[in-house]
Amino acid sequence: MANIVVKKLERTPIDETPVEIVERKGIGHPDSICDGIAESVSVALCKMYKEKLGVVLHHNTDQVELVGGYAYPKLGGGCMINPIYVLLSGRATAEVLDKETGKIVKLPVNTTAVNAAREYLKKALRNIDLEKDVVVDCRIGQGSVDLVEVFDRKRSEIPHANDTSFGVGHAPLSTTEKIVLETEKLLNSAELKAIVPGVGEDIKVMGLREGKKITLTIAMAVVDKYADSLEEYEKVKEMAHKKVVENAQKYLNGHELEVFINTADDEECIFLTVTGTSAEMGDDGSVGRGNRANGLITPFRPMSMEATSGKNPINHIGKIYNILSNIIASDVAELEEVKECQIRILSQIGKPITEPKILSIEVIPENGFTLDDVTKKATEVAEKWLDNIQNVTEKIVEGKVTTF
């Protein structure tokens, strides 16, 4: 039986506080590149394991490192000089031993991992030449498992927590959070790239709300081959600015908006790139240094420092409970009695993941409602998701869950 505690959140609703800061690192930021690769490798390994053995074996691929390359960008088109270096590390089960026959089944861990990383880079960075601009090196530590253990796992219904750890989540997103998230999604959308191809993928959106005014400061890489002159570079920024302001109108909810793009630019130095990412110019990246599981960095909300991307989706609490916390928070926030919700879930190592040590639900009731009106419904939401926690794992394995 899960230990679920529902209490009133004794704080001002986030949208009514005087100041809020929210950040999102776009998919081409070096840290986000590492997050994306780590998760893509994990998903690919999950699919390979299921195809070969019908069950996901132990792995953690959350140790991806990116070492920045060296490029010579110039208006009209520059070139890469030294490639970006990507190191895949972590651990994965690479062989299964059948003790009865003495046979060992080898599993293509390295091939699967490298292919997944390269496919992700191809998808995420439109202007990168995979043959020349990036080196992918696989140093994933390889382990083995007994075939009997594999079949035991198939029969085992509920995985046990790999660690004593916690996950956190909140809902609904504040006005500032929505605008920051949707702004980066817009700038990295296929629709916008078709109109303004000069917009690179390395985008960081920093949102500041002061009262009813939201200020967005955006760092946005521009791809050099789409800007033959400084005037064309500025035109890329102007078109992006216009689209950001237009898109934000859907989420402003009465707030004033001010948008700045590439405020460090001057005549001697602009954010010009060959590939669309600062990783080409010495900016390094690591898994877990950027967005949390909900895609945002939110210093005015509770956050976990745990990297979600690349961890195994079967029993790694740092992954499952962070994703689950956000799902439960979203469902609780949908209740008419709830204005705002925060979730914290704590595991205990070795215990079933359906039985957390505590699942804390904190709510701000809507006007006219009390905590008593909320408690039973919120508890039922949490119990439903705990009972169906393996549905969360399935969504992760299928690549249907965002981890950064």
Curated annotation (Swiss-Prot):
Pathway: Amino-acid biosynthesis; S-adenosyl-L-methionine biosynthesis; S-adenosyl-L-methionine from L-methionine: step 1/1. It catalyses: L-methionine + ATP + H2O = S-adenosyl-L-methionine + phosphate + diphosphate. Its cofactor is Mg(2+). Keywords: ATP-binding, Magnesium, Nucleotide-binding, One-carbon metabolism, Transferase. ATP binds at G141, Q142, G143, S144, V145, D146. InterPro entries: AdoMet_synthase_2_family (IPR027790), AdoMet_synthase_3 (IPR042544), S-AdoMet_synthetase_arc (IPR002795). The keyword Transferase applies. It holds the Pfam family AdoMet_Synthase. One of its GO terms (biological process) is S-adenosylmethionine biosynthetic process. GO terms for molecular function: ATP binding; magnesium ion binding; methionine adenosyltransferase activity. Its EC number is 2.5.1.6. Coiled coil: none annotated. It comes from the Archaea. NCBIfam families: PRK04439.1-3, PRK04439.1-5. Belongs to the AdoMet synthase 2 family. Catalyzes the formation of S-adenosylmethionine from methionine and ATP. This is S-adenosylmethionine synthase. The gene is mat.
